[in-house]
Amino acid sequence: MRGLDGKTFIVAGGATGIGAGTAERLAGEGASVTVGDINITGAKATVERITTAGGRAIAVEFDLADEQSIQNLVDRTIDALGPIHGLHNVGADLSENNLGRDTTVLDTDLDVWHRTLDVNLLGYVRTTRAVLPHLLKQGAGSIVNTSSGGSLGTDPMHVAYNATKAAVNQLTRHVANNWGAKGIRCNAVMPGLVMGETQERQNDQQLQQMFLIAAKTTRLGRPADLAAVIAFLLSDDAEWINGQVWYIGGASHMRQ
């Protein structure tokens, strides 16, 4: 893809799943990658796969809920890999103690709301605030946020998670609208059912069958499916695409 080779990107949430797949895809295209995650063991494993394949990457432990750790993520990237050209926000609290308790508005405790907002939404705000000034200084850059098909209102559960993802869609458009004329692109992807994201999805056979029927496809999503689209949106091949929120999950959300 055009404009990835020799560039530097931060994957904020690259220990597993879509984030790990994106980090590996970017490195495979010749980019240098910082794999940031609260799960530093997973981040280091991603980096090991990248470097073993001949790529360039570092692992940095950080927390989307901790502004100082995000600044450290940015500083470490610049010190080790050079100027930042793009950011992929993919982290979220998918733990059983948080997402597992996120049900309906009547039954979801406020501590789940606070935690979900702090990580899934404000975490993206924090990373954007930390990286955007560097992109503006260079006169160009790309941000790709991870949303969810649940932001479209089709999931009757996970009220807090889906609300934050709807807000991520608006944050994406806000950045594109305000800084597009200064060379900044910001887009988002809404993954369909991607295996490897949560253990719940791995085990729920009924959910998988429902998705296959709705998506009119022969298989479930893989991290590499999303990674290809995210890498494209970060690349110069997508320089005419800004402020868009793309659903990537078969044909279950066809639009005219």
Task: Give the label of every model feature segment.
Residues R2-T34:
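Canonical Rossmann dinucleotide-binding motif of NAD(H)/NADP(H)-dependent dehydrogenases/reductases
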Residues G82, G180, R185, I241-G243:
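Short, small/polar-rich loop/turn modules that mediate ligand/substrate recognition or access, typified
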Residues H85, L106-V125, V144, Y161, ...:
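Catalytic Tyr-X3-Lys loop
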Residues N97-L117, Q199, F211:
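Substrate-binding pocket helix/loop in short-chain dehydrogenase/reductase
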Residues T128, T164, T172:
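Active-site helix of classical SDR
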Residues P133, N177-N178, E239:
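Alpha-helical segment proximal to the catalytic Tyr-Lys
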Residues S148:
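Residue(s) in the substrate-gating loop at a strand-loop-helix junction
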Residues G153, I213, A231, N242-Q256:
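Short C-terminal tail/terminal secondary-structure segment
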